[in-house]
Amino acid sequence: FFHPKWIKPAVQVEYYIKAGLVLLGAEVLFNKILAIGIPGIFVAWVVTPIVLGSTFIFGQKVLKMPSKTLNITISADMSVCGPSAAIAVAAACRAKKEELTLSVGLSMVFTAIMMVAMPAFIKMIGLPEVLGGAWIGGTVDSTGSVAAAGAFLGPKALQVAATVKMIQNVLIGVSAFCVAIYFATKVEKRDDGQQVGAMEIWNRFPKFVIGFLGASIVLSTIAGSIGADL
C-alpha cells in the first residue's frame, strides 16, 4: 500500500521481526529452566544440537542439497524453535530471503499438522501427561503452537511443554554464533588460506541475539528478586 517516503524506515517488517525476537528473550527465565530439572534441560540442550547437526549432514550427504545456506536454515528451523531460529541462522550464514521464506513456510506447514496430530497420538498411546508435554515442547516448532498443543493434553502438559520450549529458545543465540563461525571458517573459506578474523564473525552474528540474551538476563534478575509470585 502507498505510504510517504518519510515513514518507510518505520514500516520495514524485518525490524518488527527482530524486535519480536528480542522480546522473546523476556520469557526465558533462568529460575524456570532450573525448575524443570536435568531431563528437561537434556531434551532441550543436548538432543536439539544433535538433531540440528544430523539434519544438516543428511541434507548435504543424502539429499545432496546444492545450497548449504538453505540446508542449515531449514535444519535450524526444524530442530531449534521454528521461524525464530531460522531468522537468526539465516542472518548468520547470509542466506537469501527466498531461502528464509521457504524455511519458514515449511515450518508453518509441519507445525500446523503436528499441533493437532501429536496430542491425539500421545493420548492414543497413553503416554503420561508430563512426558507428552516434554515431547511436544521438544518437537513442535513455534512457541505458541507448543502451548496450544500442550493445552490439548492438560494443564501439566501445557506447563512442561512451554517450559521445554522456553529452554530450547536459549539455543537461538548459540546456534547463530556456531553457524556464523562455521560458515566464515569452513564453507566460505578464503582461497589464500588467510585466517578469518573475529570481525568477520562479528559482522555475520545477528546483533538482535544480544538483545534476546539481555532481555532474558534482566527479566530473570527481576523474577529472582520478586520471587515466585511473578
Question: Which residues are covered by each model-predicted region?
Answer:
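Cytoplasmic-side transmembrane-helix entry/capping segments in multi-pass membrane proteins
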Residues: 7-21, 40-45, 66-76, 98-106, ...
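Transmembrane alpha-helices that form the ion-translocation and gating core
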Residues: 43-75, 109, 113-127, 222-227
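Transmembrane alpha-helix boundary signature
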Residues: 2-10, 26-40, 56-69
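Alpha-helical membrane segments and immediately flanking helix-loop junctions
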Residues: 67-114, 131-154
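Entry/N-cap segments of selected transmembrane alpha helices
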Residues: 19, 24-56, 101-113, 230
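Structural signature of multi-pass alpha-helical membrane transport proteins
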Residues: 1-12, 23-32, 177-230
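Helix-coil boundary and interhelical linker segments in multi-pass alpha-helical membrane proteins
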Residues: 30-39, 122-131, 151-160
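Juxtamembrane and boundary regions of transmembrane helices in multi-pass small-molecule transporters
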Residues: 57-64, 114-139, 164-195
